Amino acid sequence: DSAVSRGLGDVYKRQWIELEVAKAIKSGREYIEWTTPSGFVVRQRYYKKKVERIQLQLLGRCDLSVAVEDGKEVDINRHKAATAPNLIHSLDASLLHLAVRSFDEPIALIHDSVLSRCCDMDKLSAIIRETYMLLFAEHDYLKTFALYVGAETEPPIIGDLQPETVIESTYFFC
């Protein structure tokens, strides 16, 4: 039952983001922008694609629609679909960026995989946990995002997140 409640809470947060992003675009914004905790400015632009229809004749006839370039009209549906995952990915990237800056050993990052020497993993794991705790202990990123998009409604409550619990947890990130 609590897993279902948590899942519904996640859906509600995503729906809130979609609603506020749609309002921002409808009010005339051409892009959605926010700054991550590590200082990276995300500027999300989506435009409706210009589509050309072509007919192919090869072992029969085939009609295709091909996107050839971005148009000039903002694509509200792509913004709605992309903003929540992009916000989460930007927070993940910020966490990694800030953690890696504190890690003075050899490291490689490929997408969301972290590669380091085995002998350094305990140190890296501790740094990532501490960075996570510092990032999320006293800051509500949905409230900050609400300011960036000029939200008309309050963001949903994050819930009972206790970031300090990651310090002692068996599994976290790495």
Write out the residue ranges for each language-model feature:
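Single conserved hydrophobic/aromatic residue that forms the stacking wall/gate
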Residues: 1-12
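C-terminal structured domains
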Residues: 16-108, 115-174
